[in-house]
């Protein structure tokens, strides 16, 4: 349907309320990392098993034995995998083994820069060229033509403007562009702007017309 425009992002999960709402267990951080490592191994293993072959996984949390007869993906050997997070040891290690792209929230340019470097070092430790992993960052977008409009949009997504200033690209188009530039200077090759209020079409239009042209 998408002509191959598919990416898969996997993480350990962090919002306990979301898990509880759907009846999904929320184990300890170490166990969530163990499960994520197995999940990444299973997904990539299934995708790369030749047609008619057998994929076997005997892990601590998952066990399966299936034929590799899944529909082949358009992207080969498989769709890009995104791994992200701020963990300083296991997250970079998993990204080095499995990821096509590493992603982090750009709350702090200094921390993002340091985390990107940890991922590069983890790649070198397993004999992988760090250039094979793209570095990306994400920021909540809250853009307005003036201060009053920015404050209104902040209220509409339930976040005080003071809180947004650290976790978001918030402000006028010029201020949002400057915040994005900080992320790029920290090492982000790709930037994702998270839009919280999808019904605010004027917000999307403003970003599309007055921000995105200056980020290409």
Label the predicted regions.
Residues 1-216:
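Active-site-adjacent structural elements that line small-molecule/cofactor binding pockets in enzymes
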């Amino acid at each position: 349907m998408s002509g191959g425009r598919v990416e898969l992002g996997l993480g350990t999960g962090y919002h306990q309320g979301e898990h509880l709402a759907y009846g999904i267990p929320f184990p300890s951080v170490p166990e969530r990392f163990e499960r994520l490592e197995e999940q990444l191994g299973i997904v990539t293993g299934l995708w790369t098993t030749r047609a008619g072959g057998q994929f076997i996984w005997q892990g601590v949390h998952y066990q399966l034995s299936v034929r590799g007869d899944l529909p082949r993906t358009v992207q080969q050997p498989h769709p890009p995998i995104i791994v992200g997070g701020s963990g300083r040891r296991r997250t970079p290690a998993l990204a080095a083994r499995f990821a096509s792209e590493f992603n982090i929230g750009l709350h702090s340019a200094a921390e993002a820069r340091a985390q990107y470097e940890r991922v590069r070092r983890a790649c070198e430790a397993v004999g992988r060229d760090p250039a094979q992993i793209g570095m990306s960052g994400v920021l909540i977008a809250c853009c307005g033509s003036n201060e009053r409009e920015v404050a209104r949009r902040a209220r509409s997504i339930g976040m005080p403007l003071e809180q947004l200033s650290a976790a978001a690209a918030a402000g006028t188009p010029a201020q949002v562009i400057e915040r994005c530039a900080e992320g790029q200077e920290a090492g982000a090759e790709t930037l994702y702007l998270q839009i919280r209020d999808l019904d605010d079409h004027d917000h999307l239009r403003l970003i599309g017309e007055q921000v995105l042209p200056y980020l290409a």
